[in-house]
Design a protein with these regions (language model features):
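N-terminal membrane topogenic signal
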Residues: 1-20, 64, 297-301
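Membrane-water interface signatures at transmembrane helix termini and the short loops
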Residues: 228-296
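Membrane-embedded helix bundles of polyisoprenyl
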Residues: 68-83, 95-99, 121
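Membrane-interface alpha helices of multi-pass inner-membrane proteins
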Residues: 117-131, 260-263
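Perimembrane helix-loop-helix junctions
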Residues: 138-162
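Membrane-interface transmembrane helices that cradle and orient dolichyl/undecaprenyl
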Residues: 101-116
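Transmembrane-helix motifs of polytopic, lipid-linked glycan transferases
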Residues: 45-61
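Juxtamembrane membrane-water interface segments that cap and precede transmembrane helices
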Residues: 23-31, 186-218, 228-232
Length: 324
């Protein structure tokens, strides 16, 4: 069993297999949906490139290890069981903007001149919120989570708020000059909207001709929690990490918790923030499985995760060939 888990955690072959399965599932989803085209395949390419960048970004931020590729593997696995993201949509833009913002925030640790970084990071959050307006509700908590970086004070908080507001000032100025102010009303309606989407569902056969529809949002939450909770417990109990590394991980955990709570209160956030959640849980969750100490319980947990993933992947394929 230890050899199996070592292969999954440390082998680049495991990452390549996960990436190829993910690409295959998404290409099939694009063809099956009939929404193919340049944008859909560009979307696929962006997710592939982004997955390749996760490892190097984590290593530069001192939150990852060069000895493991598991965070990248988990990212591709999370994408593979969510083929509804294959079609080009706003979530792709939000993913790039939000994770770029997180990386800028990770450079502010004890920074005496962090105002520029806070402004730039939250300007990206502001742009992302133009695509997903209800993200604005999470901004105060995102700012507070930056307190783990020991650089949050009155001036940096003001810089963060200004960063969020500047994209709106530019956008509304353009709308005013082009006589498209009616779009502001559409933005406000989206900001104040409740649950206004039809969640994708996974249909599980429970009998002859009968199926049980499980919302993909529930499946994603279970998958994310199974990854994140053990890692968070280990992170809390372990004192071996560097101080800066722990600060960055605390901020990431705070942001992930903010997204979880936000999605529970405003489920419509799930549509655009789902890929961000996949990325954060992959980044945080891998830490539980890379400990030097051998643990049969950890090995069983990892293999259980992979079995569940294969089951979900298989049900997705079965759903594609079945009619209801």
């Amino acid at each position: 069993m230890n050899k199996i888990t070592h292969f999954i955690v440390h082998s680049k072959v495991a990452t390549a297999i996960a990436a190829l399965l993910y690409i295959g599932v998404w290409i099939y989803a694009i063809i099956e949906s009939g929404n193919g085209g340049v944008l859909s395949y560009l979307n696929l390419l962006l997710y592939v490139i982004f997955g390749m960048l996760i490892g190097s970004a984590n290593e530069r931020a001192a939150t990852g290890s060069q000895r493991t590729t598991l965070h990248t593997t988990l990212y591709y696995m999370g994408c593979a069981i969510n083929p509804q993201l294959a079609v080009w949509q706003e979530s792709t833009i939000c993913l790039m903007l939000m994770v770029a913002a997180y990386r800028i925030m990770a450079t502010t640790y004890r920074g005496r001149t962090a105002m520029g970084s806070y402004f730039a990071a939250f300007a990206l959050v502001g742009i992302a919120s133009i695509y997903s307006p209800q993200l604005l509700y999470l901004v105060p908590v995102l700012i507070l989570c930056c307190g783990f970086m020991q650089s949050l004070h009155a001036r940096t908080a003001i810089a963060a708020l200004l960063g969020v507001l500047v994209p709106y000032w530019v956008a509304f100025s353009i709308l005013y000059l082009t006589d498209n102010t009616h779009l502001v009303q559409s933005f406000v309606e989206r900001l104040t909207a409740g649950v206004s989407y039809a969640p994708a569902a996974l249909h599980v056969p429970i009998g002859k001709g009968d199926t049980l529809a499980i919302p993909m949002i529930a499946i994603q939450w279970v998958w994310a929690l199974m990854l994140a909770i053990p890692a968070i417990i280990r992170h809390t109990l372990s004192g071996t990490s560097k101080v800066k590394t722990r600060a960055i991980q605390n901020m990431q955990i705070g942001h992930m918790g903010t997204l979880f709570v936000g999605m529970l209160i405003l489920p419509s956030l799930y549509t655009t923030m789902q890929p961000v959640l996949i990325t954060l849980t992959a980044t945080i969750g891998y830490g539980f499985f890379v400990s030097e100490n051998k643990s049969r319980g950890r090995d069983i947990w990892l293999i259980t995760l992979f079995v569940i993933w294969l089951l979900i992947l298989g049900l997705n394929v079965w759903n594609s060939f079945s009619t209801y």
